[in-house]
């Protein structure tokens, strides 16, 4: 049986791929592996961006493997512990200080949307994507942060529309409501995600982390608290070798070459 969890690094960009065709259901141990590996990935100074995708071009993920949930709950000791682990993994992605990019193609349902919601960039295929949180049709609710993160990304009205009606949207509608930052042809999707990761990898590391910390953090803070975070970010990055290089490059009308400080 093929390993449903694939990991690789190319040009400072780490890629996690679900590999369980055709629907790429996320097995219980996929999350176990992410929880084990993400701390090392996020602390590695040579990894400057992360891409979450899936093998092939059929589907990103149709969600969690529901048949494995009872086994996962038994191993975790309780439903609360089982889902707490999943929230820990998404919190690491969202708050880890490394830009995370997700790809939407084919089915992106349930956990196949909730994991990307913890990422900082989402790119969709221009054809064939079916994105949604269908838990209402199962008599349940999103269990992996979907009802908390989706309204922060697209607003309350669109989130209620998608969740209460279990409505699936395509890539173009996802772009219109702000769920994704861009839409590209399916055959270009993975290359575009890699290219974006490589572009982000050239940016000054401390400044990237400071911006992520400030913008992600502002969603749960007051304006005054967020401004204080920004002040601290400015103080931490101003005067670093990379900021000096950026200023010099601007004045000399050339492209900066950062040393990743």
Question: What is each model feature region?
Answer:
Residues 1-53, 91:
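Conserved CoA-thioester-binding segment of acyl-CoA-metabolizing enzymes
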Residues 1-2, 248-261:
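Terminal low-complexity tails and localization/encapsulation signals of metabolic enzymes
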Residues 110, 166-173:
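Acidic, divalent-metal-coordinating active-site segment for phosphoryl/phosphodiester hydrolysis
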Residues 54-92, 108, 222:
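Glycine- (often His-adjacent) and acidic-residue-rich active-site loop
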Residues 89, 93, 103-104, 109-163, ...:
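CoA-thioester-processing core
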Residues 124-129, 180-228, 235-236, 241, ...:
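C-terminal long alpha-helix characteristic of the crotonase
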């Amino acid at each position: 049986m093929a390993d449903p969890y694939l990991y690789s690094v190319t040009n400072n960009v780490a890629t996690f791929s679900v590999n369980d065709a055709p629907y790429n259901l996320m097995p219980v141990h996929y999350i176990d592996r992410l929880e084990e590996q993400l701390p090392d990935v996020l602390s590695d100074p040579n990894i400057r961006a992360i891409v979450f995708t899936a093998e092939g071009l059929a589907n990103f993920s149709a969600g969690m493997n529901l048949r494995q949930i009872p086994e996962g709950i038994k191993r975790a000791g309780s439903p609360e512990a089982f889902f707490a682990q999943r929230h820990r993994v998404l919190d690491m992605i969202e708050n880890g200080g490394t830009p995370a990019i997700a790809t939407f193609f084919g089915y992106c349902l349930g956990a196949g949307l909730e994991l990307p919601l913890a990422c900082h960039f989402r790119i969709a295929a221009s054809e064939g994507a079916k994105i949604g949180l269908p838990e209402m049709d199962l008599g349940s609710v999103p269990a992996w942060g979907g009802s908390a993160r989706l309204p922060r990304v697209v607003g309350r009205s669109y989130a209620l529309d998608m969740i209460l009606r279990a409505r699936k949207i395509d890539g173009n509608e996802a772009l219109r409501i702000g769920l994704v930052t861009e839409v590209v042809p399916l055959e270009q999707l993975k290359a575009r995600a890699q290219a974006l990761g490589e572009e982000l990898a050239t940016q000054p590391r401390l400044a990237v982390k400071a911006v992520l910390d400030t913008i992600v953090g502002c969603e749960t803070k007051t304006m005054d608290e967020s401004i204080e975070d920004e002040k601290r970010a400015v103080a931490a990055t101003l005067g670093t070798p990379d900021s000096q290089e950026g200023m010099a490059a601007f004045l000399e009308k050339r492209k900066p070459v950062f040393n990743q400080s």
